Amino acid sequence: MGSEMCIRDSAKADVTAMVKQILAQYRVQLENNTWLSPATKQKAMRKLATMQVKMGYPERLFSLYDHLSVDADDDLLTAILKLSAQTQAFWFKQVGQPVDRNQWNMPGHLVNASYDPLKNDITFPAGILQPPYYSLKWTRAENLGGTGATIGHEISHSFDNNGALYDEYGNLHNWWTPADKQAFDQLVKAVSYTHLRAHETSLHL
């Protein structure tokens, strides 16, 4: 794949090591947490432990492409309509099937990163593992300040007000005790942007 030509295995290994390092710090933070009950804390630790890391580019093409075909004589509109119908048919067949956690939701060349609560995974395509975000020539401190901040940000989505609704398998399932969920909601309100105002205008930010 094209992305494979843009990122060395050493860079993939280096950023993967950074992910493991930051995940370890998340575990330390959870261990030292003072407001979560042991039951919820244990489930949060399990969610971290089962989080999958996708780095650089997918090892195989998305299986959807095995089901797409057009005729050489098709005009553009006909080809688009055929591909659209084939894509819809593919997704309908996925209903009720086990989730393929190895499937990527973004291409390897994309300059972005993501956390998927439905799979409990974080994805770092080759596109974002390039300057000005990352370089093997930079110091560890520089890479932690750039890519490391992005890694920490994406992991945090697993415990934000949306990610917290899903368990370690990506199921929409409440894994919080009522008291812990109430405490979490109160802490979320404390950092809500709705409480911030621009002093010059008195408008909410």
Residue ranges of each PLM-predicted region?
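Short, small-residue-biased leader/transition segments that mark boundaries at the very start
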Residues: 1-7, 198-205
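Intrinsically disordered, low-complexity linker/terminal regions across diverse proteins
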Residues: 9-197
